[in-house]
UniProtKB/Swiss-Prot annotation:
Enzyme class: transferase
Function recorded in the entry: Catalyzes the ATP-dependent transfer of a sulfur to tRNA to produce 4-thiouridine in position 8 of tRNAs, which functions as a near-UV photosensor. Also catalyzes the transfer of sulfur to the sulfur carrier protein ThiS, forming ThiS-thiocarboxylate. This is a step in the synthesis of thiazole, in the thiamine biosynthesis pathway. The sulfur is donated as persulfide by IscS.
Chain ranges of the THUMP domain: 61-165
Family the UniProt entry places it in: Belongs to the ThiI family.
Record's subcellular location: Cytoplasm
GO cellular component: cytosol
EC number(s) recorded for this UniProt protein: 2.8.1.4
Keyword terms: ATP-binding, Cytoplasm, Disulfide bond, Nucleotide-binding, Redox-active center, RNA-binding, Thiamine biosynthesis, Transferase, tRNA-binding
Organism of this sequence: Sodalis glossinidius (strain morsitans)
Pathway(s) the chain acts in: Cofactor biosynthesis; thiamine diphosphate biosynthesis
Protein name: tRNA sulfurtransferase
Organism domain of life: Bacteria
Length: 483
């Protein structure tokens, strides 16, 4: 089994020293990943391509699939390597391999050569193509947009019969650019933006601001691990988790409603910048897209940037949501993102779209920055390779979901204030109380603990996460209400 790896074109136009460094890094990345598929694999680099050889034919599908997910590869050619004697011998070997595939179809022959020969690539194309056209039933030559393209490579005295061409991921090999820290929430945007920087050659570490307890963190860890396992497994990265619930509570208590969203984002940037500085990471990555939500206007993004000197990269800045969701589907994070609730955008009822710097600084002047410093100091840092084993050993937490209401039960509407006011929840003969999810941690203990509380939200996702969080805190009198 042999594969020929073709380099991403932008690599080939680099200077000699840079190109050689990129090829060395890509070769190392391929070795690191393929050793999990086949320990016998051999990876050999050349100036314009990389060869991959593996002894066990059973591992061919695994190796091929893994190669398509490694940044820096333009395409992969699965080949059969054979000796050849003359041009007619090349034709005969090609006929045996392609005869059945070409019956009733149009085709063309494309040849590449390396070495010194007494014929040109075009000579081989004409000779082999003419022979196939005469000896394969009901076929015809078509040089543009044929049904089948017969790909051949002649490498000195070896004939490479290309059995399959697989498209690669493109981009630069991971490790050719510097490290970044992705602010990951588990939603569509942050997952796609992380992938885009991995594809561009960055080793992507992950920073998660936990507002929803352990259940929320597990979901985000799954997204981060999926991205790493699928596209970045060649390198070790960190997953950093910060408990940001105290920071949110401080904002809710000290900051005016319309400024809360911007202040929260600025606090996240400050915290992430401190983490990046600790580990020598050069830039932050966010999934913000221009105008998608109120905090993502140019005025507000500029104010968010001003919170830190650390470079903030926004690869999705000009992308629309439909395109982002399409990319999430392609990279496999869509299913995770569908069930991930949005936290940051619901703490403010009337967020400003044109924040004023002096006003933001005035609001932040009332904020106790010791709370933020504590969150950074207590950040949990995990090697992403340990996440699966750690989650596999953790007990699976569950909480009961019900549509039935008892006479003494209380339905607790945990939606944000504007959602509650826009669509109030009214139930006959059942008490309904309101307590936004971001206040549950600090206010649930003040409620009458002799009663059973059924947590409600529109989709049932946020209510389940919050019920699990309350269970972790020792409250057993909670269920999820799904009418």
């Amino acid at each position: 089994m042999k594969f020929i790896i073709k380099l991403f074109p932008e690599i080939t136009i680099k200077s000699q020293s840079v190109r050689l460094r990129f090829i060395k890094i890509l070769t190392s990345n391929i070795r690191n990943i393929l050793k999990h598929c086949d320990e016998s694999v051999a990876v050999v680099r050349h100036w314009d391509h990389i060869e991959v050889r593996a002894g066990d034919e059973q591992h061919r599908p695994l190796v091929a699939d893994a190669l398509t997910l490694i940044p820096g590869i333009h395409h992969i050619l699965a080949v059969e390597e054979r000796p050849w004697q003359d041009m007619h011998d090349i034709y005969l070997q090609t006929l045996v391999m392609y005869r059945d595939r070409l019956v009733g179809k149009s085709f063309c022959v494309r040849v590449k050569r390396r070495g010194t020969h007494d014929f040109t690539s075009q000579d081989v194309e004409r000779y082999v193509g003419g022979g196939l056209n005469q000896n394969v039933d009901n076929t015809r030559v078509k040089l543009t947009h044929p049904d089948e393209t017969v790909l051949l490579e002649i490498d000195n005295d070896r004939l490479l019969l290309i059995t399959e061409r697989l498209e690669g991921l493109g981009g630069f090999p991971i490790g050719t650019q510097e490290d970044v820290l992705s602010l990951i929430s588990g939603g569509f945007d942050s997952g796609v933006s992380s992938y885009m920087l991995m594809r561009r050659g960055c080793r992507v570490n992950y920073c998660f601001f936990n507002l929803g307890g352990a259940a929320h963190e597990i979901g985000v860890r799954q997204v981060a691990h999926h991205l790493w396992r699928r596209f970045g497994q060649s390198h070790k990265v960190r997953f950093v988790s910060l408990d940001f619930a105290p920071v949110v509570n401080e904002i809710l208590a000290k900051v005016e409603d319309g400024q809360m969203g911007i202040v929260l984002k600025r606090m996240m940037v400050r915290a992430a910048s401190a983490i990046a500085e600790r580990y020598g990471i050069q830039a932050l990555v966010t999934g913000e897209a221009l105008g998608q939500v109120s905090s993502q206007t140019l005025t507000n993004l500029r104010l968010i940037d001003n919170a830190s000197d650390t470079l903030i990269l926004r690869p999705l800045i000009s992308h629309d949501k439909e395109h982002i969701i399409t990319l999430a589907h392609q990279i496999g994070t869509e299913e995770y993102a569908k069930t991930m609730p949005e936290y940051c955008g619901v703490i403010s009822k009337s967020p400003t779209v044109r924040a004023v710097k002096s006003r933001i600084e005035q609001e932040e002047g009332q904020f106790d920055f010791a709370v933020l410093e504590t969150a950074v100091a207590q950040a949990q840092v995990v090697d992403i390779r340990e996440l699966v084993a750690e989650e596999g050993n953790a007990p699976v937490a569950e909480v009961e979901t019900t549509a039935e209401l008892g006479s003494g039960d209380v339905v607790l509407d945990i939606r944000s204030q504007d959602e509650q006011e826009g669509c109030p929840l009214t139930l006959a003969n059942v008490a309904v109380q309101t307590l936004p999810f971001y206040k549950l941690g600090s206010h649930f203990g003040e409620l009458d603990q002799s009663k059973l509380y059924l947590l409600y939200c529109d989709r049932g996702v946020m209510s389940r996460l919050q019920a699990l969080y309350l269970r972790e805190q020792g409250f057993q009198n909670v269920k999820v209400y799904r009418p």
